[in-house]
Amino acid sequence: AAGFVKRHPVGCLLALACVLVIALLQSCSSSLVSIGNAGAGALGATTYPSEDEAILGAEAAYAGLEAELQTYLDTYESTHDYDEYHFDLDEIEHDPYVLISLLSALHEGEWTLSQVEGSLQMLFDRQYILTERVEVETRYDSDDEPYSWYICYVTLENKNLSHLPVSLLSEEQMSRYSIYMSTLGNRPDLFPDSPYVDKYITNPPEGYEDPGEY
């Protein structure tokens, strides 16, 4: 072998160089695959796991619960029989990205509408607190005869869906929720009218870094 190397030094050097180049290319290819897998994993971790049908269906179902509540309040006086009414009502509203991020944090992995129906009702009941209270006063007519006067007080408190995660989610779930909210699940096209699209996507605050870019 030593004699062969002495007789063909240039050829041996070329062969050695080829081996080194092949090894280098294999190493680079392996590194690129690892980087690609890591990038795909990071993107997947920040993207809503469910199909559009489930996401849009969940939003529509929640909006339906809100519509029922609004109708109940709008027709309250015509469907009740009290003498006097006092209303103190917060606005009925929610942000769809907050809702979907909450559902995706509560249900790890892909979920369907039927799987989150219970969570939708739970979130709705926590967000909206409706209180109805009736007081009865004794009044007197022109003949000084007593009669009962019924006064109904209706209060609706909107706890704000975005305030629920702190008391509702575990530490791990809170981490997922925060990531989904910061990226909007990588789906700013789903609910373009949401103010969060402008806040995080269109005009992100100075110094803000998208977790999906890590």
Give the location of each predicted region.
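Membrane-proximal envelope biogenesis segments
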Residues: A1-Y214
